Structure formats: C-alpha cells, structure tokens
Swiss-Prot record:
EC number(s) given by UniProt: 3.4.25.2
Protein role: Protease subunit of a proteasome-like degradation complex believed to be a general protein degrading machinery.
PANTHER family hit by this protein: ATP-DEPENDENT PROTEASE SUBUNIT HSLV, METALLOPROTEASE TLDD
Taxonomic path: Bacteria, Pseudomonadati, Pseudomonadota, Gammaproteobacteria, Pseudomonadales
The protein, known as: ATP-dependent protease subunit HslV
Example of a GO MF term: threonine-type endopeptidase activity
Ranges in a coiled coil: none
GO biological process: proteolysis involved in protein catabolic process
Statement: the UniProt record of this protein carries the keyword Metal-binding: yes
Active site: 2
Source organism of this protein record: Pseudomonas syringae pv. tomato (strain ATCC BAA-871 / DC3000)
Pfam families: Proteasome
Known regulation of activity: Allosterically activated by HslU binding.
Subcellular location: Cytoplasm
Residues annotated as binding Na(+): 157, 160, 163
Amino acid sequence: MTTIVSVRRHGKVVMAGDGQVSLGNTVMKGNAKKVRRLYHGEVIAGFAGATADAFTLFERFEAQLEKHQGHLVRAAVELAKDWRTDRSLSRLEAMLAVANKDASLIITGNGDVVEPEDGLIAMGSGGAFAQAAARALLLKTDLSAREIAETSLHIAGDICVFTNHNITIEEQDLAD
C-alpha cells in the first residue's frame, strides 16, 4: 500500500505521498508518484491502494471535475455515486484524497466522501502513524503545512514497512 498525508495550514494546502509499490511482501518500485495535480493544476490528488485501480479513479475523477467545472465537492460526490453503483468500479481497491483551495476530501469505494474537520487527511497503510504525527505537530508547533506533511510521512516510513521515504509533495496557496 502507501501513505498519503494532506495538511491545510497558514494559507496553504499540501499533499504528500511516499513512492513505494508493493506486491504482497515484496517492494516492486520505490519511486512511484502517487500525488499529482488535476484539472488545470487547481486540484491536488493522491491515492492509496492498488495502483491500476487508482489510475482508473483518477481518470474518472478528472472527468467529473471537467463535467462540473472544477467544483471539487460535486465531482467527488458524483464519483462516489458511480463507484457505488457501477459494478466494474465497485471492485476497485483504492482510496483518493483530493484537495483544492476550498476543501480537502477523502473518497472511498464505499461511496463515502469525507471532509475532515481539521483539514488533515492521512490514509493508507501508514495513515494512522502519519495522522498521529501530523496532529501532534499541528497542535504543538508552528511548522508549515509542508514541513508537517513531510515530517509525518518520514515518521510513518520509519514505522510502516509498506511506506518509504521517497516523498512526492504538491503544494497550493489557498488564495489562488
């Protein structure tokens, strides 16, 4: 699996993910890019789960963004509806984290679209470790969103065998 972290702080939203691709207990690749920009660079998206499934979901989500003129929540809800009702999609094993200047969301294969209260998303195999680290850093430091995302992923990578330290980070100003 992998670990994805997204943090909103000090006028920025940051999403970061590690680069490990595993097949069972074997590391197949260490430098995969699991965080990318969508919809003319206005949306940051990351995935945890099966890589091929995630690419399918990225394509479907980007199509929904185009259809709904970049409206993040509407596109996420429509993707989640499709995911629940389309038989081929319902078998996909991946989760998406998406963020723009207005919101940060988790989209699951169960049809859930969740906007965390504190603007913090952590998911994947190392998600609980990254979330604990990021939450502590948010509460007890004045670090930037980027520093929190990067540090929490490094901590998750130290603990979770399915998370490495090859990190991809995307950052966006909330004022854009």
